[in-house]
């Protein structure tokens, strides 16, 4: 009889058929521990075996094993969504409890399987089901420090103030687990009232702060409190002298975001003022100090009051820097440069004004236009049907389903951590516009980049004639330049603002040209920035099943300072494209890749793994400029071949 259970666990279908069909062994026979063959098949995800056993009368809800569990419990312990789905379709009861008092939802949390948790929740299972000790799934998830599952349960409406037998709340359990992210998530959903919840542990009343202090994680708990507008206050009330109360000054995240954007105008305005008015020696000292201390103050203020992980991506600071530089230079040009150059160079001056207005319009449209948000499905029944379709195609994984949005991810879409939404044909999140670049605004973004890369050289041209035709300011006629001489010295005495602005714009123009070059190459091969990064890392345009968001380090936010700068300016993407050379199709590996047997880029050709390539650069460009990416049925077909 033991051969039946071994064959069922190892997927030996022919052996199982012979043993059952010959009627030598009952299909519901149990081993020494009371488990049936269906238990072992479910545990090891042997769905063909499960199908055969159920067709021959196996009890889908048979109780067995040391923990008196059903086959669906064994499958849930392994986090096998497909097996659980198959058993549910054939009558398995997901609400059954084992000897420990756990049902499938509890076991899915223990198995750290967010996909299984989402699947079970869509079966109309209560998110707050309790075990025999009155623990909810949220308590277990926060105890294990599983942020994705904690987030899923909270998004589904889990009770953050539920208590177990010891009056422990999910917040208490997150403190026991010592996970900062789970603490933040629970506090964000109102996981603690102004008068702190107390837990009765061995006859002692413990508030969350007392428990955090006892477990030596008070520093983490304090960070979580600050990021949610709370603080610890001393009091004489029982059971302890410390309570958690709201901060005296509370500002919404929207207020801080506006502050972050508008402060950039002050920073750059004062910078230009210092560089234009003060002597060069003094300005070269004061201006960098001004930028450093103001930036440090803003970042400290933001991090101390709102929960921000990636400052550059989740705040419009860089968008404010870009907008403010453009604003101050543009205003100076309209007030001083254009009136002087219009009689001398009327065509260039008018062209500068026209293109500058066009550039402003394209920038505003790129920044505020819907990048292509994936429409959310509100009804649970519809979402359940979508999950079932994915399971039938064996596509229910984090590449095709977003755990944060609870929805199917269309082809070429990714979840943006900064925008908190899934984006159709996601290219990248641009910190300089404060918005994602996706299906709806990618063309607008590209037009803006082209326009800006054209506008800056025109500014240099009209600024040159402006400086050539204005006299030295009277207050500077007796001045002498210390570090510069000749024409540059004369220009600095005429209008230092133009020189500083020109140098600033030249630095920006360099990376804008690099960005334009990179985008042209990618459009020519019908590939997005996100897809190219995936190709570089994995040799495919589709992320591994464990990936459910936009590719990590998409802007070089993690790592060294140089990598951060390169990522923000887009230089890293250009370097990758240059290394791919040969029209950016053939990959040439680095020395490290040559020594790695697992490298995916060795002798890899982008065109062979790119299902979206039309076969020629002209066709790819036509597709980009004419095609409606939101209603393209061909992309579904292309995804099947990846």
From Swiss-Prot:
Segments forming a coiled coil: none
Membrane-related topology note: Multi-pass membrane protein
Database matches in Pfam families: Ank (PF00023), Ank_2 (PF12796), DHHC (PF01529)
Transmembrane helix recorded as keyword: yes
A GO molecular-function descriptor: protein-cysteine S-palmitoyltransferase activity
UniProt KW keywords: Acyltransferase, ANK repeat, Endosome, Golgi apparatus, Lipoprotein, Membrane, Palmitate, Repeat, Transferase, Transmembrane, Transmembrane helix
Span of the signal peptide: none
Ranges where the DHHC domain occurs: 400-450
Chain positions of ANK repeats: 1-29, 33-62, 67-96, 100-129, 133-162, 166-196
Record remark on domains: The DHHC domain is required for palmitoyltransferase activity.
Family: Belongs to the DHHC palmitoyltransferase family. AKR/ZDHHC17 subfamily.
Protein's recorded name: Palmitoyltransferase akr1
Organism expressing this protein natively: Schizosaccharomyces pombe (strain 972 / ATCC 24843) (Fission yeast)
């Amino acid at each position: 009889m033991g051969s039946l259970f071994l064959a069922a666990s190892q997927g030996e279908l022919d052996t199982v058929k012979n043993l059952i069909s010959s009627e030598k062994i009952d299909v519901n026979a149990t081993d020494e521990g009371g488990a049936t063959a269906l238990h072992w098949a479910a545990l090891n995800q042997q769905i063909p075996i499960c199908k055969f056993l159920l067709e021959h009368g196996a009890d889908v809800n048979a109780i067995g094993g040391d923990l008196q569990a059903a086959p669906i419990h064994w499958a849930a312990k392994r986090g096998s969504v497909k097996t659980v789905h198959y058993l549910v379709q054939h009558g398995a009861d997901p609400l059954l409890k084992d000897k420990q008092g756990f049902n499938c939802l509890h076991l899915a949390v223990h198995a750290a399987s967010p996909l299984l948790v989402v699947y079970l929740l869509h079966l109309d299972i209560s998110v707050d089901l309790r075990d025999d000790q009155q623990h909810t799934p949220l308590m277990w998830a926060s105890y294990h420090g599983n942020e994705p599952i904690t987030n899923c349960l909270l998004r589904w409406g889990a009770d953050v103030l539920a208590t177990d037998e010891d009056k422990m709340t999910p917040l208490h359990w997150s403190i026991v687990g010592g996970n900062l992210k789970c603490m933040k998530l629970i506090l964000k959903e109102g996981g603690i009232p102004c008068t702190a919840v107390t837990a009765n542990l061995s006859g002692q009343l413990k508030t969350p702060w007392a428990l955090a202090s006892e477990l030596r994680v008070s520093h983490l708990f304090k960070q979580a409190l600050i990021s949610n507008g709370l603080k610890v206050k001393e009091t004489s009330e029982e059971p302890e002298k410390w309570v958690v109360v709201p901060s005296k000054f509370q500002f919404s995240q929207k207020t801080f975001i506006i502050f972050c954007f508008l402060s950039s105008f002050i920073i750059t305005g004062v910078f230009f003022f210092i560089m234009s008015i003060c002597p060069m020696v003094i300005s070269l000292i004061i201006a960098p100090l001004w930028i450093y201390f103001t930036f440090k103050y803003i970042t400290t203020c933001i991090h101390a009051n709102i929960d921000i992980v990636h400052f550059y991506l989740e705040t419009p600071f860089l968008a404010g820097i870009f907008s403010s530089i453009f604003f101050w230079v543009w205003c100076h040009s309209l007030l001083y440069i254009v009136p002087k150059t219009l009689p001398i160079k009327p065509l260039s001056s008018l062209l500068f004004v026209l293109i500058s207005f066009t550039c402003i319009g394209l920038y505003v449209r790129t920044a505020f236009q819907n990048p292509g948000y994936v429409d959310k499905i509100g009804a649970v029944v519809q979402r359940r049907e979508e999950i079932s379709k994915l399971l039938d195609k064996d596509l229910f994984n984090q590449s095709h389903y977003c755990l944060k949005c609870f929805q199917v991810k269309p082809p070429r879409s990714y979840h943006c951590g900064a925008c908190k939404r899934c984006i159709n044909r996601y290219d990248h999140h641009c910190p300089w516009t404060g918005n994602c670049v996706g299906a709806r605004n990618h063309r607008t973004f590209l037009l803006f980049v082209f326009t800006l890369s054209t506008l800056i050289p025109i500014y240099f041209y009209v600024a040159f004639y402006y400086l050539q035709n204005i006299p030295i300011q009277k207050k500077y006629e007796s001045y002498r330049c210390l570090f510069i001489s000749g024409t540059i010295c004369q220009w600095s005495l005429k209008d230092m603002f133009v020189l500083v602005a020109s140098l600033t714009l030249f630095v920006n123009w360099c990376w804008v040209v690099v960005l334009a070059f990179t985008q042209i190459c990618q459009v020519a091969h019908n590939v997005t920035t996100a897809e190219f990064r995936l190709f570089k890392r994995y040799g495919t345009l589709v992320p591994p099943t464990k990936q459910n968001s936009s590719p990590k380090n998409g802007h070089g936010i993690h790592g060294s300072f140089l990598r951060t700068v390169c990522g923000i300016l887009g230089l890293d993407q250009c370097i990758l494209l240059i290394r791919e050379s040969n029209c950016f199709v053939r990959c040439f590996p680095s020395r490290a890749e040559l020594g790695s047997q697992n490298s995916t880029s060795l002798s890899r050709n982008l065109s062979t793994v790119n299902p979206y390539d039309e076969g020629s650069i002209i066709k790819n460009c036509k597709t980009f400029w004419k095609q409606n990416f939101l209603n393209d049925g061909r992309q579904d077909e292309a995804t099947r071949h990846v």
